[in-house]
């Protein structure tokens, strides 16, 4: 194998964009560019979701339509599930990954918008403020922490399966106390996922996988918000 031409040394950028290298091992310039992309995409996703939810809440005709069409939320949820699998498979294919990202975010925003129409505006605002505050605090904590949070991944996913199973059983054994406990447990679980995914985007992903990083954090935010909605609603009923 021929030696590389000394006139054209391999750049650090080439090294950083090898899929085997993590963001944390890249140069400061690459790390900052990666974080800007991730959090810019995430901000746009949250903005689209917020605007869509506001439209659904503001217009009475829209609320009435979605309440009379319960199949809509299932359609949006299944569509977003299909697109997220397509995104994972095509996350390195630009610009296809961005088109899939937009489609996924739009369907997820529509799903959230339908859900919030069943809640009081005051509770929605409380959940939104809490979600924003918690996400910002956990992000700052994780990015400056020297701890290795990757070891918590298996436990978090095991707890997620337990939460999903408990949510299924809730349909057969519903109680207000159970709803309160599951909502609180779900909110705490996704706080854990925010820490885990923030740590993972720096230590497990390559600099080109910013779309995957944004999706992970977006789903964490949405799930935290929805569980806080349920929790606050359950508390207000007590």
From Swiss-Prot:
Give the superkingdom in one word: Eukaryota
Its GO biological process annotations read: apoptotic process; endoplasmic reticulum unfolded protein response; locomotory behavior; negative regulation of apoptotic process; negative regulation of neuron apoptotic process; regulation of calcium-mediated signaling
Which residue ranges are intramembrane, renumbered to this chain?
Answer: 209-229
Q: Just give the chief location class.
A: Golgi
- Could you tell me the membrane topology recorded for this protein? Multi-pass membrane protein
Q: Which GO terms describe its cellular component?
A: endoplasmic reticulum membrane; Golgi membrane; Golgi stack; membrane
What keywords sit in the KW lines?
A: Apoptosis, Golgi apparatus, Membrane, Transmembrane, Transmembrane helix
Q: Which residues lie on this side of the membrane: Cytoplasmic?
A: 1-38, 90-97, 142-151, 197-208, 230-238
Where located?
Golgi apparatus membrane
One Pfam assignment? Bax1-I
Question: What's a Gene Ontology MF term here?
Answer: calcium channel activity
Annotated transmembrane regions? 39-59, 69-89, 98-118, 121-141, 152-172, 176-196
The record, for CDD domains, names:
GAAP_like
**Topological region Lumenal:** 60-68, 119-120, 173-175
Q: Which PANTHER family match?
A: BAX INHIBITOR-RELATED, PROTEIN LIFEGUARD 4
Q: What does this protein do?
A: Anti-apoptotic protein which can inhibit apoptosis induced by intrinsic and extrinsic apoptotic stimuli. Can modulate both capacitative Ca2+ entry and inositol 1,4,5-trisphosphate (IP3)-mediated Ca2+ release.
What is its quaternary makeup?
Interacts with ITPR3.
Q: What family does the Swiss-Prot or TrEMBL record give for this protein?
A: Belongs to the BI1 family. LFG subfamily.
The name this protein carries in UniProt is Protein lifeguard 4
Annotated organism of origin: Homo sapiens
